Amino acid sequence: MPSYRWDNAPVGHFLPSLLTTSGAHGGTDSAGACMLNVFRLSNGRLFQEEIETSVIEQTQVQPVWVDLEAPTREEKEWISARFGVVIPENIVDDDLEESARFYEEDNGELHIRSDFLIEDGETSRNVRVAFILHSGILFSVHAEDLPVFRLLRLRARRIPALIEDAKDVLLKLYDADAEYSADTLEGIYDSLEKVSHRVLKQDVDDRAAGEALTAIAREEDLNGRIRRNVMDTRRALSFMMRSRMLNAEQFEEARQIMRDIDSLDSHTAFLFDKINFLMDATVGFININQNKIIKIFSVASVALLPPTLIASIYGMNFKSMPELDQPWGYPFALCLMVASVAAPFIYFRRKGWLR
């Protein structure tokens, strides 16, 4: 399978629209008609078209996939009237119960809600996508365009016989999602290697350690999102396999994707261990630097104790202190104080406590 850059994957093959086109994700024209992104199969390839709802009844387009990116109310209402499927108002929910996110209606309509990863440099996030499989057509609803969707559109256009029906579209999306997660994990490993080279060198100051901690925390967050993403994909595939909606070839493909996800699980666990090691090492270097500062103050305070004692002794107001009456008494006290400071420093230096 040829590899493609995720960030440069084209949005898709846009055939000439039947009427005035709008944005890439659909919209409405001045007359109020909606533009939809529909995908049809032609000679074993998947092609994307922007079709106006006002004339779709007169076209011969038989979509296999209808992709709704940030759909308007008019688009949802038209989809419901034209295809008899209800598009959910809110696709983002926090219910982790499988029965709430993966279920089948009495009429055979399948509903699946999955998370897909977006990693664009400094930030990463999971985007919820609602899938509805109705009458041989896959409907997908999401708030923004996804790298996984772009990759599938690119591959399905270039590779013949990659997709045969709507269920293949859904499986290929999950397959591309697993591959995208694997590529992102490789990027995390490369980033951690760079951090490791910086942290494990001989001298690490507090500034470098702080930058390393920031980078490690960012990679830990991304690794956690990937772990959650592949877990969600596994649950969706498991539901599809249990629902007996797949033929033998599709079932085997789903099992292969599950095996790929299992390998990603072990890799994320390895990266978590590496992140914890680098985190502990970085915090350890920060503690060492702080201990060096504390050691300097400790040595200085110990070295200044003897001259303080000498000054205290000669500051006592006793009559019988012969040195006070001698002309050399004051220089003698100063020299004694300097010697009492120098002697501990020389001793500490020989012991290696000043390093």
Which residues fall in each region the model found?
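Hydrophobic alpha-helical transmembrane segments and their immediately adjacent juxtamembrane loops
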Residues: 2, 7-10, 14-16, 20, ...
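Peripheral, non-transmembrane regulatory/ligand-interaction domains of membrane transport proteins
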Residues: 2-242, 246-248, 256, 260-263, ...
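General secondary-structure edge motif
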Residues: 59-60, 168, 210, 217, ...
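Short acidic-hydrophobic sequence patches enriched in Asp/Glu that either
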Residues: 148, 253, 327-331
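Long amphipathic alpha-helical coiled-coil segments
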Residues: 236-251, 278-289
